[in-house]
From Swiss-Prot:
One of its GO terms (cellular component) is cytosol. It comes from Pseudomonas fluorescens (strain ATCC BAA-477 / NRRL B-23932 / Pf-5). The gene is cmk. It comes from the Bacteria. Belongs to the cytidylate kinase family. Type 1 subfamily. It is found in: Cytoplasm. PANTHER family: CYTIDYLATE KINASE, CYTIDYLATE KINASE/PANTOATE-BETA-ALANINE LIGASE. CDD domains: CMPK (cd02020). This is Cytidylate kinase. Its EC number is 2.7.4.25.
Length: 229
């Protein structure tokens, strides 16, 4: 691990806004960005495409080690794009079903082990903003600033509904709330790397906060610690 490159971790449940905040923070600082959830979504998506059983740990571990993936950085006019085996799968990975598959494979110890070093390889100068569910507890336990971002299940479902409304047929607020609660249950109860705040994490409830308010609070913590120089 490159100790010269500081890491800020942002963990939290599905729909808490951690991906949005991490992206904005990385852009503001000019740092690298790790969307760890995308790696699990990629693996689950690739497994389904290759006919790999989502409960077969050894096959998933092998697939994880050889994922042909590229992350194309965001630009002023375009968001980050994710290329799997030569195809742009960015939009496919946002599908709720892919998210459910990702949660399933993320509970497997062999899969998490296979992706651990791949995630740590993102730590490069000038620094890294890493978002996920175990960034501060497992992947980067020595990070100088750890954020645990949450929001009520109802608010997270509402945010997701607004994102999907008009884009996905048949989406309902009640079904999204059920999915989020089920996802929370899987993520917090899994035996390996369960979703929980690191002991030294700063916990932020974004239920009644705007994106900019959350970002400003994190920037204040960065300034206090003089992390970004």
């Amino acid at each position: 691990m490159n100790i010269k490159a500081p890491v800020i971790t942002i963990d939290g449940p599905s729909g808490s806004g951690k991906g949005t905040i991490a992206g904005k923070l990385a852009k503001h600082l000019g740092w690298c960005l790790l969307d760890s959830g995308a790696l699990y979504r990629l693996l689950a998506f690739a497994a389904r495409n290759h006919g790999v059983d989502l409960t077969n740990e050894e096959s998933l571990k092998l697939l994880a080690a050889h994922l042909d993936v590229q992350f194309l950085g965001a630009t002023e006019n375009h968001p980050q794009r994710i290329i799997l085996e030569g195809d742009d799968v960015t939009d496919d990975l946002r599908n709720e079903q892919v998210g459910a598959w990702a949660s399933q494979v993320a509970a497997l110890p062999a899969v998490r082990d296979a992706l651990l070093q791949r995630q740590r390889a993102f730590q490069e100068p000038p620094g890294l903003v890493a978002d996920g569910r175990d960034m501060g507890t497992v992947v980067f336990p020595d990070a100088p600033l750890k954020i645990f971002l949450t929001a009520s299940a109802e608010e997270r479902a509402r945010r997701r509904y607004l994102q999907l409304k008009g884009k996905v047929d048949g989406v309902s607020l009640s079904s999204l709330l059920d999915e989020i609660r089920a996802r929370d249950e899987r993520d917090t109860q899994r035996a390996v790397a369960p979703l929980k705040p690191a002991a030294d994490a700063i916990q932020l409830d974004s239920t009644e906060l705007s994106i900019d308010q959350v970002l400003q609070r994190i920037l204040s913590e960065i300034a206090i610690r003089d992390i970004a120089g």
